[in-house]
Amino acid sequence: MNSLFASTARGLEELLKTELENLGAADCQVVQGGVHFQGDTRLVYQSLMWSRLASRIMLPMGECKVYSDLDLYLGVQAINWTEIFNPDATFAVHFSGLNDTIRNSQYGAMKVKDAIVDAFTRKNLPRPNVDRESPDIRVNVWLNKDTASIALDLSGDGLHLRGYRDRTGLAPIKETLAAAIVMRSGWQPGTPLLDPMCGSGTLLIEAAMWATDRAPGLHRGHWGFSGWAQHDEAIWQEVKAEAQTRARKGLAEYSSHFYGSDSDARVIERARSNARRAGIGELITFEVKDVAQLSNPLPKGPYGTVISNPPYGERLDSEPALIALHSLLGRTMKNQFGGWSLSLFSASPDLLNCLQLRADKQFKAKNGPLDCVQKNYHLAEKTPDSKPATVAEDYANRLRKNIKKLEKWARQEGIECYRLYDADLPEYNVAVDRYGEWVVIQEYAPPKTVDAQKARQRLFDIIAATLLVLEIAPNKLVLKTRERQKGKSQYQKMNEKGEFIEVSEYNARLWVNLTDYLDTGLFLDHRIARRMLGQMSKGKDFLNLFSYTGSASVHAGLGGARSTTTVDMSRTYLEWAERNLRLNGLSGRAHRLIQADCLGWLREANEQFDLIFIDPPTFSNSKRMDESFDVQRDHLVLMKDLKRLLRKGGTIMFSNNKRGFRMDLDGLAALGLKAQEITQKTLSQDFARNRQIHNCWLITAA
């Protein structure tokens, strides 16, 4: 009997133990990452040929303590390598693990290689050659703390390499994991199986091979035992012949069918090729079809199983499309596949929750470094009184109500950009803004007392409901997370897409960028203030301080201003402002753009203006400014400097976003100025619920 070890992906150890026991293995012991077992030579070959779950089958050769590199060398050399393989066989060493002595795996592999080679040369035998690509013998050494475990890898290449798959395309899951997913799905061979996002077909091919009794090792051309001195070719040929006979019989007797679809035609062609190479191509029908086109191939029965490894995303901007996909999949399952079973494997449990289905079972597994979950569902049969499932119903109803009220108003006003929802319901704490055909959802960062997982799931529900209610494509929805901005973060780029969209606001055309920055380039709550500036500016010299993207300058220019001067510290925003001005035919000497610290520029400037708009930050301590600025503390100093630039009879429109801002009216009077608050006049219908989003004042000479 041989002592053997079968490695596997984390989470599959018990499943592998059952498989090995069914093959005839004895004394199976589960450890993390694999199973120790006993078996004769035939069982060695049976496990290599038939295990669908093992990553590798190892023959342990011994262990040694490693306190120095010499210990490693001597421990390896103590093994009788000349009885394990012949000198004309090539070999390779795979070394993993480090300790205080062996700090580099390549160095460890070199010491092992030297020990093996010297074991031959000291017996006056030829030196065996190293072949890293396709060796006859693979030696595996695993160093754990101060113990090195040495084994012969009888698999050669990993057992997930079945020999049927085109290796040019990256696969999201290995064949061994795919087989485990099929086994855990609850699917019964002989019943229909469908994968609506099949990719290169791995799940369906593994299922078909299992169902038709086709050994996973049948198509492999190279093994790690080919140079092993104990290899018994006669027994191996018997095992191989038996596998071929069973495969032919299984294929001839199998009557059910498999269905696979994917939106990518190239991937589907690869799946067809893989299935043909696996010998089960005739059993699987592949179609180019996305989830939106999915229908039940057997509406009159029998019931089957839907299985898939749907895509998931690591980037925030990919989530709307994935949420839409999972929501659509859930609806399609309920509408088209009543009575069927569903099994999905994913690295994102949150996305699976978007199905709006309750799982009967779930399993955990690792896919490489990713923690994944497999959830199994039973899809209830549809009855005449079945109600369609809803997601975030209260939010969806409020959004519909707001749209009904605001869409007509926006058309009458001549605006394309407006707020549809602003945390109307406390549990759905987001803002939803429309920009023409696009929608931006801004999530207000939840307080630390709110469970992060629940908040994330609530956000996913909001996205799914928004897509349903507005009937927009997922690629037209942009997701942002808004929290208190500190220092430079309010100006930092989120992406580098550089996608600008042209929108209309009254008679102005403006560029917005929905993806690259936290803000879009257009503060929607200032819309009426900008229109007022346009109406006030005819024949006047207009100054726009802290100008952002210059939209107020555009309105002033279109309103007939004699000149506009646009000042901001950011070159990016000034270039954006220039684009906005040009888009409206406003260019030349009459429309100046100045990059400067606005407060410093204001102290030095000596020009005169009839109309000044200033919308300073609530607080700023930028390194490019000489000192910090607090709008509550410093607004009188600001007014003193502005008064110096204000032409007789001129007006300052002053706005800020500080909640609870108190204008120092006595201080203004001492400066010879008076203020009229116009906040309520500048709040439009879409901001009617948020009366404190900004405050706005007209300031003139007393």
Swiss-Prot record:
Catalyses which reaction(s): guanosine(2445) in 23S rRNA + S-adenosyl-L-methionine = N(2)-methylguanosine(2445) in 23S rRNA + S-adenosyl-L-homocysteine + H(+); guanosine(2069) in 23S rRNA + S-adenosyl-L-methionine = N(2)-methylguanosine(2069) in 23S rRNA + S-adenosyl-L-homocysteine + H(+)
UniProt EC number: 2.1.1.173, 2.1.1.264
The protein's enzyme class: transferase
A GO MF label: 23S rRNA (guanine(2445)-N(2))-methyltransferase activity
A GO CC annotation given for this chain: cytoplasm
Compartments, record wording: Cytoplasm
Family: Belongs to the methyltransferase superfamily. RlmKL family.
Name of the molecule in the record: Ribosomal RNA large subunit methyltransferase K/L
Gene: rlmL
